[in-house]
């Protein structure tokens, strides 16, 4: 007989207080059809590919570290559009609106030929090749070898109006007192990716300085560094979407060599030493006495990867990208008039070898070659050029819009001079004439407060573009590409004629006061 029972499942009720909804920038920002082109100079940097070079005292940096495996983080500073002397003042009403920039197009230009760079360590911790081993491996006190390899191939760029968020694994604080020699706990940390931070080259995104005390497990360029990787999951789920409008990446690698580490194993393979011998012969059977296998070898296996073929057929650079719809709520609006472009590209990773004759005399007078008479140097160069298409947009000064902007970044309202102005305590102030006179009181020692940079202390490649904007898009390569793809050109019998693109969305005509 069928019997009815009440539902035993939980009943979920909506929250008592409404959840604040974050609006997309497309919901409240009005776009005009005024476009600007901006580009940087040729940006060049030269340095040593593996480490900083200091003087003998270690007090002066003589040659900085410049590697193809580093992140390049460009901070493009744009002019304030609200201070522009616009020819058509009907573009916006300063009493009810503010102007902002929107990114519509981007092209990251890269110079220099394609090339593969190698990295390595003169004391690399590898015992032997474990892929094609013809004898059993035995350890000694020092099995390090001079080894080099090519890194994982990576091309990537991230565009946003705040710095890119990176992730790496670092040493964590133990819950209690930890015995010396035990593996420390590790945790995932989020930090901003700064200019010069190393990218992952095949050994993971960890703090090698804190987690590898032997200083021989990785190559020279990262042995004293922290390799970071963009935290795409965090940036894609950001409520405002300022750190990453869009990105492009291409990574590839394969395991080229297989080695094993030297040293004492920290985590022994479970065997007869566990418990009362209940794990005996579970993972291996010991070798006979007198055999090389009587002492078990290390199981710390690892590969050295290779980035494989570098080809011009798979390049992300030297080509335009158009932003129609960003992945987050911010559809390309450049708050605070700045733009962050984070780039990694090691497909142009050639390291120059420079040899210098260290003896007196000319090279033509050398009788016999002697390697001791020549000094070998290494240098790496990077070449960039960035072009952007900017669109002029209007932000209405409405209560709901200002409330969201204030919650997102209250300093924007201060820059727009919309902050709260308190009522003066005294309508008249005291002003002395002779401030340097001994008969007059000392002036106020507190200096005026300067604007605090929210990214003070972080290292970026600052590029000033306040005077590099142009309305003549057809005079630039990226501008002509934008006009063509946007349909702002029309073909006539006499040639190609550009339709006006400097117009704007005209506002309501103001009434004259009587």
UniProtKB/Swiss-Prot annotation:
It is found in: Virion; Host nucleus. GO terms for biological process: endocytosis involved in viral entry into host cell; virion attachment to host cell. This is Major capsid protein L1. HAMAP family: PPV_L1 (MF_04002). Transmembrane segments: none annotated. Self-assembles into homopentamers. The capsid has an icosahedral symmetry and consists of 72 capsomers, with each capsomer being a pentamer of L1. Interacts with the minor capsid protein L2; this interaction is necessary for viral genome encapsidation. Interacts with protein E2; this interaction enhances E2-dependent replication and transcription activation. Belongs to the papillomaviridae L1 protein family. Keywords: Capsid protein, Disulfide bond, Host nucleus, Host-virus interaction, Late protein, T=7 icosahedral capsid protein, Viral attachment to host cell, Viral penetration into host cytoplasm, Virion, Virus endocytosis by host, Virus entry into host cell. InterPro entries: Capsid_L1_Papillomavir (IPR002210), Capsid_L1_sf_Papillomavir (IPR036973), dsDNA_vir_gr_I_capsid (IPR011222). One of its GO terms (cellular component) is host cell nucleus.
């Amino acid at each position: 007989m069928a019997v009815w029972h009440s539902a035993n499942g939980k009943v979920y009720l909506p929250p008592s207080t409404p959840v604040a909804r974050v609006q997309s920038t497309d919901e409240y920002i009005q776009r005009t059809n005024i476009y600007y082109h901006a580009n940087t100079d040729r940006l060049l940097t030269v340095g040593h590919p593996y480490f900083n070079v200091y003087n003998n005292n270690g007090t002066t940096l003589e040659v900085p570290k410049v590697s193809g495996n580093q992140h390049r983080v460009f901070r493009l500073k744009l002019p304030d559009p609200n201070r522009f002397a616009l020819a058509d003042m009907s573009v916006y009403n300063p009493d009810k609106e503010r102007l902002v920039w929107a990114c519509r197009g981007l092209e990251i230009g890269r110079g220099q030929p394609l090339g593969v760079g190698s990295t390595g360590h003169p004391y690399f911790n590898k015992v032997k090749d474990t892929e094609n081993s013809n004898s059993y491996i035995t350890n000694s006190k020092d099995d390090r070898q001079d080894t080099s390899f090519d890194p994982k191939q990576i091309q990537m760029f991230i565009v946003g109006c705040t710095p890119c968020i990176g992730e790496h694994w670092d040493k964590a604080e133990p819950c209690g007192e930890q015995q010396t020699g035990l593996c420390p706990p590790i945790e995932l940390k989020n930090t901003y990716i700064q200019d010069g931070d190393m990218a992952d080259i095949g050994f993971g995104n960890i703090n090698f300085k804190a987690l590898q005390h032997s200083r021989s497990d990785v190559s020279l360029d990262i042995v004293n560094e922290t390799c970071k990787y963009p935290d795409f999951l965090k940036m894609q789920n950001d409520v405002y979407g300022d750190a990453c409008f869009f990105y492009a990446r291409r990574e590839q690698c394969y395991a080229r060599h297989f080695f094993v580490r030297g040293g004492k194993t920290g985590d022994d393979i479970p065997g007869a030493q566990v418990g009362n011998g209940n794990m005996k012969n579970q993972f291996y059977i010991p070798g006979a006495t007198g055999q090389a296998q009587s002492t078990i070898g290390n199981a710390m296996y690892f590969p050295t990867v290779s980035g494989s073929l570098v080809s011009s057929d798979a390049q992300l650079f030297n080509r335009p990208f158009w932003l129609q719809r960003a992945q987050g709520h911010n559809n390309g609006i450049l708050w605070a008039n700045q733009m962050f472009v984070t780039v990694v590209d090691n497909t142009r990773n050639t390291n120059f070898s420079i040899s210098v004759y260290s003896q007196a005399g000319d090279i033509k007078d050398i009788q016999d070659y002697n390697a001791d008479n020549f000094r070998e140097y290494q240098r790496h160069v990077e070449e960039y050029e960035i072009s952007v298409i900017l669109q002029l947009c209007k932000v209405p000064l409405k209560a709901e819009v200002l409330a969201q902007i204030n919650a997102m970044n209250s300093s924007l309202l201060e820059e727009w001079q919309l902050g709260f102005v308190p009522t003066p305590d005294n309508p008249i102030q005291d002003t002395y004439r002779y401030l340097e006179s001994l008969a007059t009181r000392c002036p106020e020692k507190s200096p005026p407060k300067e604007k605090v940079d929210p990214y003070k202390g972080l290292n970026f490649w600052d590029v000033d573009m306040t005077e590099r904007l142009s309305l003549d898009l057809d005079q630039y390569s990226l501008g002509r590409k934008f006009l063509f793809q946007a349909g702002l050109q029309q073909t006539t019998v006499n040639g190609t004629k550009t339709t006006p693109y400097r117009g704007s969305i005209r506002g309501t005509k103001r009434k004259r006061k009587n």
